[in-house]
Swiss-Prot record:
Name assigned to this protein: Serine--tRNA ligase
NCBIfam families reported in the protein's UniProt record: serS
Organism this protein belongs to: Acidiphilium cryptum (strain JF-5)
Binding site for L-serine: 236-238, 290, 394
Domain notes: Consists of two distinct domains, a catalytic core and a N-terminal extension that is involved in tRNA binding.
Entry's Gene Ontology BP terms: selenocysteine biosynthetic process; seryl-tRNA aminoacylation
Function: Catalyzes the attachment of serine to tRNA(Ser). Is also able to aminoacylate tRNA(Sec) with serine, to form the misacylated tRNA L-seryl-tRNA(Sec), which will be further converted into selenocysteinyl-tRNA(Sec).
Compartment(s) where it occurs, according to its Swiss-Prot or TrEMBL record: Cytoplasm
Keywords: Aminoacyl-tRNA synthetase, ATP-binding, Cytoplasm, Ligase, Nucleotide-binding, Protein biosynthesis
Amino acid sequence: MHDLKAIRDDAAAFGAAMRRRGLAGPEGADEGAAAPIRALDEERRRAQTELQGHETRRNELARAIGQAKRAGEDTTALEAEGTALRQSIETANAWLAESARKLDELLAVLPNVLDADVPDGPDETANVEQKRVGAPPSFDFEARQHFELGEALGLMDFAGAAKLAGARFTVLRGDLARLERALGQFMLDLHVNEHGYTEVSPPLLVNDATMYGTGQLPKFAEDLFRTTDGRWLIPTAEVPLTNLAAGEILDAASLPLRMTALTPSFRSEAGSAGRDTRGMLRQHQFWKVELVSLTTPEASADEHERMTSCAESVLERLGLPYRRMLLCAGDTGFSSAKTYDLEVWLPGQGAYREISSCSNCRAFQARRMNARYRPPQTGPKPAKPDFVHTLNGSGVATGRALIAVMENYQNADGSITVPDALRPYMRGCDRIG
């Protein structure tokens, strides 16, 4: 959600910020997407001023009627005016309530303002590579994709999953199921024991307000799964973890608040028809380790770098080649002000593919869910609460990490070497197949 006062104070700047996102606003409006917001806001402010005048006059009439009655004077005209005023006040209050709802609707579907250092560009082709870590493996055989390896081993069953649930699901068996579980446990242990995150086990079903708080609703309902009782399956643990602060005022001394969770994630992939139809890259259900941080406005940029480094350490411990990408304006997510994607090398595809996104959402989500903190007191009175900054990142997607391990650690005979970091979680198993 956006700060209405900031839009009011500089509608042109807000309009320019939305144009970076590809939102031009009404034709001919210099203020762009801010124009309808500012127009409705100004109309509301005029109506509020008029309402205050009506309420003042109503109070004056009440006193005048009382005085007239005590003096034995006729109050018919005064009472008629009072009746008309009550109707005007009721009408004005109803309009203000409806216009407030419309204003919220206008604001709720506008994306976050991007940081100044986010590059312009329409889509992923304009993303900027910042660094590469690790060299892609060199095989003396033709690298196979993960689904070819998994099916040949008899440990990855797409036909069985389709029988149970339809397309974009997978059944893992035996050592591949163990390997996926090992990846999740390894990541959790790393983030908790070395990076200072607190493990949380959150609900997988949440309500409308929770989805609204992190920005999934109202704009992206078609990307989500909804139950018959109106709850939503979480698309990422970011949703419940971040919303734990909804409506709270946190003590500044408790920040940064760092949380992690290993949960299933559920996505309809409504806009992905025809993309990655084979294998596990794009699933309706997948496991993911999520990282969430709540911090002060002054610390959020550094926290973003730290969180991204924590996610990178997973790939480095696993010996997986990757690159860090700074997303451009057209590829940055709705709630994010700045996002880094980590892309892991997949030899079977001969390409880097996303395995983690780490985003600084600034105060955007906090304003939607009213998550605040109280700065340290510096004067005679307690400091006024301010919105926290929220950050989230994959630390990392477990299913995609499984794919990356399979493809980067494959052998000529179709077996898979287990990375050293995972062997303690595999009871010493060093090879699958």
